[in-house]
Amino acid sequence: MTRRARIASTIGALAACIAGAISLHAQQRTVAPTTFTRAPMIQALPPGEIEILPVRGNLYALFGAGSNIVVSVGADGVMLVDAGKAGMGDKILAAVQQLSREWTKRNEPKPLGWGAETRSSVADRHITAPPKPIRYVMNTTVDADHIGGNEKLRNAGRTFTGGNVAGDIRDSAEGAAILAHENVLTRLAASSGEGQNALPSDALPTDTYFEEAYKLSHYFNGEGVRLLHMPNAHTDGDSIVYFRGTDVIALGDIMSSGAYPVIDVAKGGSINGIVDALNRVIDLSQTEFRLEGGTLMVPGHGRMVDSADVAYYRDMLTIIRDRVDAMVKKNMTLEQVVAANPTGDYDTEYGSTSGPWTTRQFIEAVYKTLGGGKPAAAAPAKRPARKP
């Protein structure tokens, strides 16, 4: 066999080996066709159940109480933003007491390395301290699912006003303070006259503000707390609550993640007020990296969000508002606007055809607050031409 023939034979043998290896590898890698399945949706909480989630620092969120509730727990006591609906009062109070007990246990003083006399007179005196009381309840709006638990939470809390005390100092305590915008108290008081739905006095706000903002006069649980009025948004008495140290904002009903916002036209709400409120929240917030993270926000309903979520929500509402506004300027009727489907791009994420707040109700509220349905203003009469 010549040298050329040997080389050709070797190359042929190598090619045959490679082809066989490729065929065997392909047989080994043969798998069933790939199939894709949709991940199951997050299960909703069973009715009447409350879920506690940590937000940041000493702040927690309660879900399932009718409205989302933000709870601050610390050395100064307990503060709640909103009180849920009336039927959930006992479970809300149980969740708050659980958080307070856990905080007290985590912050028990460590054993002191001093003499026995000091340990018995100092440490033991604090280890048995009871859980901290509820000091404040903030109402972000007038709705029943936000103020329903006011009475029970107020009566379970304590406010020490100082002054002369005869006897036990605990006897001088009042219930927890309830803070809200003045319009909330005005509307609740107006609906609390003689009648079946009258609210007891303990369910009404004890302190109100009527300016642009209100801040506590002192730190509470290590941070400043401010209430800021959002005029004519969901209603005319909406507030957001800004926890400055932990950088968390309780939004109330100016946003509902996963749903269009409820605009209560009868109580002064408007689409422009909602958009303005969201713009103000975005100005207050700070992102951590590339529009993500940073300031955390708890809306009145739905999951927690950050400033990127709020900006997307604001943009969505602005687009819908501008579409409806253009139709109003063309003197289109409400039925024509609904038929034009101005929310169509977003209905899969935010829309609803049933329940307490539907897509049609949202479109109608936007339409009305933009002046839709009002008779067009009469054109000014022309002056008669002067005779020459």
Regions found by a protein language model. Give the residues of each.
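Divalent metal-coordination and catalytic microenvironments
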Residues: 58, 72, 82, 96, ...
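Accessory terminal helices/loops
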Residues: 18-42, 287-293, 303-388
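Bacterial N-terminal signal peptides that target proteins for export
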Residues: 1-13
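Active-site metal-binding motif and surrounding structural segment of the metallo-beta-lactamase
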Residues: 76, 87-170, 174-176
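Cap/insert and terminal regions of metallo-dependent hydrolase folds
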Residues: 87-90, 100-129, 144, 251, ...
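N-terminal pre-domain segments of enzymes
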Residues: 26-49, 104-105, 111-129, 381-385
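Metallo-beta-lactamase
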Residues: 167-231, 235-236, 245, 276-285
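Conserved beta-strand hairpin/beta-sheet module of binuclear metal-dependent hydrolase folds
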Residues: 51-111, 239-243, 247-253
